[in-house]
A protein has these predicted regions:
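Short strand-connecting beta-turns/loops that link adjacent beta-strands
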Residues: 36-38, 76, 135-136, 149, ...
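Composition- and surface-driven signal marking solvent-exposed, interaction-prone regions
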Residues: 55-57, 156, 170
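Extracytoplasmic/secreted cell-surface and envelope-processing proteins
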Residues: 52, 92-93, 130-131, 150-152, ...
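Active-site-adjacent helix-turn-beta-strand microarchitecture at beta-sheet edges
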Residues: 2-11, 21-28, 121, 130-133, ...
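Extended active-site neighborhood of metal-dependent phosphoesterases/phosphodiesterases
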Residues: 1-65, 165
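A short C-terminal boundary segment appended to hydrolase-like catalytic domains
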Residues: 160-238
Length: 238
């Protein structure tokens, strides 16, 4: 899907949101969807695919006008608006800020906080994490796990009648599934041991590639001189 055009993407996911969209942004792939009588999803297209696909995220200038309209409609309809985007709203990553955080995200933060929107869901990193815009005020952001990434968990979000919310994760028991389906794959049968090591290797390789491709020659030299223990510690920073 990384090489898909905007039109192709909308066609691929037609049965997973677009066909039942309440409203569509004419300038992007953003749309709204009524999850229930009191809950509306604001699905924001933060991807950059024109003229070329980019890793980093951005909300188009024209889309902000559409967002303002949706904020007003949600208030008029008396529904809770839950914004969702692929890229992160806040600086969730320590080393991948440029690739993960939406460009000029403060503009989006200001709009959402003006309307007292309490929560924003995102992915991209897909490392289960949450933070708040400011320590004692502002919007919360939850970076949701990827079900395909160890420890293979999904999020359960509950909105209460008093307009507060709770969120927790639920792990998928891969070892139980493997036994039930009589799998012979040792990695699945011993998933709780295999998964952490596999994920650590992924993060290590990502960190290595980021340093290796750095324009600063000194960065590459530093990596070469790191001990095995230091490199393993680096793989845990994301």
């Amino acid at each position: 899907l990384f090489r898909s055009t905007a039109d192709e993407f909308a066609k691929i996911y037609n049965d997973f949101g677009y066909e039942e969209a309440l409203d569509r942004d004419p300038a992007s792939l953003s749309y709204t969807y009524d999850l229930g009588p009191d809950m509306r999803l604001l699905m924001l297209d933060s991807c950059q695919y024109s003229p070329v696909n980019k890793v980093g995220g951005m909300i188009k200038t024209e889309t902000y006008d559409w967002i303002d309209d949706q904020l007003e409609k949600a208030w008029e309809d008396g529904v809770i608006l839950l914004p969702v985007a692929h890229h992160n709203l806040l600086d969730e990553s320590k080393i991948y800020v440029e690739d993960c955080t939406i460009e000029h995200s403060e503009e989006l933060v200001d709009r959402l906080e003006e309307e007292d929107i309490p929560l924003f869901l995102s992915g991209h990193l897909h490392v289960q994490h949450y933070m708040r815009d400011e320590e004692d005020r502002g919007i919360y952001e939850i970076v949701t796990s990827s079900l395909s990434t160890p420890p293979c968990q999904y999020g359960v979000l509950e909105y209460r009648d008093d307009e507060t919310f709770s969120y927790h994760t639920q792990k998928v028991d891969m070892e139980k599934w493997a036994r039930k389906h009589k799998s012979t794959d040792e990695n699945l049968l011993n998933f709780n041991t295999y998964a952490p090591a596999a994920l650590k290797t992924i993060f290590y390789n990502q960190s290595y590639d980021a340093m290796k491709d750095s324009e600063e020659e000194e960065t590459g030299d530093i990596f070469v001189k790191l001990t095995k223990s230091q490199k393993e510690q680096m793989s845990e920073v994301y």
